[in-house]
Amino acid sequence: MKPGAFALNPHAASYVPISKRVDYGGGDDGLVFAAKSPTVEVSMPKKSSEMAYKQIRDDDLDLEMDIDMDIEYLLVTFSGLSQESITDVYLANGGDLEATIEMLNQLEIYSTESEENLPETLDIGDISESGPSTSKSTEVAASTSSVIPNAPVSA
């Protein structure tokens, strides 16, 4: 066996990495090894790219200031709500201030209507006055009171 030859295929050529292979379109296999390919660099003038970056940054800053001003306005207008809630509603509406105000107004209206239906106090011992559960609980109470005798307990 020749030195540097492979046991499985003694006629195989050495491996050439893909990055060093070049295809010229001519020849049998189309590859020429270890040839440098010409590189082309395209660049924009620095002044225009710097100006474009500054414009994008300024636009983002203006947008951020607009969002902050809208949220501050909403916080003042709807002082009973948290900043997180207002921000969530604002972002859910895609930054639309008018839609956010409308949604928060509806939230205030519905929250005051629901408070009117709440009882003054809530207690675990409160029994619902509606449905068949009331009649069952009164029947159970009546049956348990009649079963227990009033006999004196001796010590």
UniProtKB/Swiss-Prot annotation:
Gene: CID5
Annotated stretches, region: Disordered: 114-155
Physiological role: Promotes polyploidy in dark-grown seedlings. Regulates the endocycle leading to hypocotyl elongation.
Gene3D superfamilies: DNA helicase RuvA subunit, C-terminal domain
The name this protein goes by in its record: Polyadenylate-binding protein-interacting protein 5
Organism, as annotated: Arabidopsis thaliana
Further comment: Overexpression of CID5/IPD1 leads to increased ploidy levels and longer hypocotyls in dark-grown seedlings compared to wild-type.
Biased segments, Polar residues type: 130-148
Residue ranges of the motif PAM2-like: 7-17
A molecular-function term among this protein's GO annotations: ubiquitin binding
Signal peptide range in chain numbering: none
Domain notes: Contains a PAM2-like motif, which seems to be involved in the binding to the PABC/CTC domain of PAB proteins.
Organism placement in taxonomy: Eukaryota, Viridiplantae, Streptophyta, Embryophyta, Tracheophyta
InterPro entries: CID5/6/7_CUE (IPR041806), CID5/CID6 (IPR038981), CUE (IPR003892)
Residue span(s) of domain CUE: 66-109
Domain of life: Eukaryota
Expression by tissue: Specifically expressed in immature siliques.
